Amino acid sequence: MANKWVYLFTEGNATMRNLLGGKGANLAEMTNLGLPVPQGFTITTEACTQYYEDGEKINDEIMGQIMDHINKMEEITGKKFGDKENPLLVSVRSGARASMPGMMDTILNLGLNEEVVEVLAEKSGNPRWAYDCYRRFIQMFSDVVMEVGKKYFEALIDKMKEQKGVKQDVELDANDLKELANQFKAEYKEKIGKDFPSDPKEQLVEAIKAVFRSWDNPRANVYRRDNDIPYSWGTAVNVQMMAFGNMGDTSGTGVAFTRDPATGEKKLMGEFLMNAQGEDVVAGVRTPQHIDQLKQVMPEVYDQFVKICHTLEDHYRDMQDMEFTIEDRKLYMLQTRNGKRTAFAALKIACDLVDEGMIDEAKAVSMIEPRNLDTLLHPTFDPEALKKATPIGKGLAASPGAASGQIVFTAEEAKEWADTGKKVVLVRLETSPEDIEGMKASQGILTVRGGMTSHAAVVARGMGTCCVSGVSEIVMDEENKKFELGGKIFHEGDVISFDGTTGNIYDGAIATREAQIAGEFGRIMSWADKYRRLKVRTNADTPHDAKKARELGAEGIGLCRTEHMFFEGDRIDAFREMICSDTVEEREKALEKILPVQQGDFEKLYEALEGNPVTIRFLDPPLHEFVPTEEAEIEKLAHTQGKSVAQIKAIIASLHEFNPMMGHRGLRLAVTYPEIAVMQTKAVIRAAINVAKAHPDWNLKPEIMIPLSSDSKELKYVKDIVVKTADAEIAAAGSNIKYEVGTMIEIPRACLTADDIAKEAEFFCFGTNDLTQMTFGFSRDDAGKFLNAYYDKKIFENDPFAKLDQVGVGKLMKMAIELGKKTRPELHVGICGEHGGDPSSVEFCHKIGLDYVSCSPFRVPIARLAAAQAAIAEMNNK
């Protein structure tokens, strides 16, 4: 049987999301629920994938099914494409299985041409509406399908408004719009070199191809990479009969949420515009009215809409984001989906749904996007500083948080300035999808136009970036890079602050303070902890970091990098003395100076962790990272050592390595300079003995981690030194403290010989940053130079340093665990690379049987939640 590439809305349902995309599946589900949905059909995601496999062509089989479904649609609607009596007009929209707001393109009013527009004008008795639809269609088709920029058409509209002495598009009459349509077609011909297509079927095929193509546009690729959406999924295309919101004052269009997407409050939240089409609300060109005002304008429609909102939320058991159109007092539902929301709102909604009996705790934990928790942990304005500040303006509080930075006016500049380390805020009339890179680089986004559902608001909420939109009192001069607000002119580079929770805007910088987390956050986290199996530790080198991580729920330290401690104060001088010493005695003398301060550091860490596990990694970086580069510092070192500057420079030169990442570092340092390992072991054990004495009820068991093993013999050599030193210290103190010696697995050979290495190591911890480097054979610091080309050419979908490569690096990890546990069944295994805080990597760690993940302090809640979600998913799949 031939593949089915096209489905009517009556043939699908919500479970077919992978095939029909989110929008298509939900249109089918709303149809099944008996809601007023303009009918149509969905071309599947598989057809999109096939389109790319066929060299960006729609093959005959798929084309045949599309044409069959056009005929079926004509039968259902009683209208015909290109007909002089009763013409069918459609919208063409994309819809991937994961919601990608603003990433994919829409075309409305398709099916119009010179003849059809005249029929519509005459039949409806509303020529203004007919020509408004036509000029919009030409503009959208030109922009989305043929890539003739919107700006050319906007300029023609502005010119026409100027000639007519009007301010708003809605003030142009039928003749003006008819003239604009002609000007648009002339513009199209000039840019494309051929006439605007008049055959509705040709228009439709070109539009479908454009939606498929937009799956691969640069902004879709960026969004996919940021949100772990595979390229192979493809997008579906929805072809739907038009419902017209621009037929006059009894028509309109809007977007609404069943709960507030910024705060989570249980109240209908949304906006509508009378005499407008769907894109007008989202594009933010005119600032819309609040949904509550629909009650005054059209009470019956409002009541019907509220009822539908309840139906949909009860059905999907989640907050819904809906698009609707009113055509001459008749309500049509164009879309519903689980709404994008801020992290704050997500927690509140999840807890409220549990309290309302709609969902259970496991479902509540599963519906929070772990990465979004980041935003809750970000600073807010300091209340005292805020009291002294006077707002100079106010907009809509579109996405919470506090932003201070230098003003930039374009996305490109935002990225360029941010790359040099500057904090910037992006100020725009309105944002569009191509601004995504600049939006990511900004501390916050401020727009003059647009409402709570504009592109800027939706994308900023998704990214966890502060946003204030609809600041209509700004007088903008983008060309000269300045604007006026509150009686003051602001130029590029000036500093402003704004609050995405209140919408207030301030002149200058305002002090921020650490985020406060409690309430719903605590509830969700306690539920998450009930379900997860993986322990979550933190990477911390200071008591301050350790304390913060404990507050955020860390159950230990998975990685304490001891080298960071050597850079503090005058310790670096002693360490440099050690490096430049000629004899073992001289080195030991220098290390004796470091021992008490290193011991003191460890004592503070043990205190901060209150008896929870602490893994201390011995010295890892190559020695050249510690030597001075400034002339004055070199002279100071020469003086201390009683050597000449030339001798010190010769020592520094001798430390130079061609490939330091694979050079004299890690346990290789301990092999050549065992006295370093001796000093560090003494510091670890003495600190543990002292803290254990002070807190006899704590179960303190230091974990000593030897970095960069590649062979069991080198590990045994270093471990023997550690054990001999530790046992002597414990005996001398008359203590009974226990300790463990393990290793960091970060070289592929260690994974391949893990059965041997486990004879010496009591635990493994995967250092996935280096393991990724060594497995791929590229350096983390240089990979950025070519990774973008790899994304563009579809060789890689993600940065393997941000998201664990499960196929290669993951296979090595799995092998190491299996081999290691054969030798030592009680072996405990963790991960402490940056991947420890990446949700998809945490899920993989759960699957392959790790005992813990360790990540930076602020990612601890993300890892806790991701670990719980992995356990719940496994439970649900059984």
Write out the residue ranges for each language-model feature.
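Protease-associated
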Residues: 358-442, 504-509, 521, 525-528, ...
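C-terminal domain-closing interface element
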Residues: 334-336, 491-539, 545
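Nucleotide/phosphate-binding sheet-loop regions of phosphoryl- and nucleotidyl-transfer enzymes
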Residues: 1-389, 422-425, 432-437, 443, ...
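Short beta->alpha connector loops at strand-helix junctions that form conserved
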Residues: 41, 448-450, 469-472, 560, ...
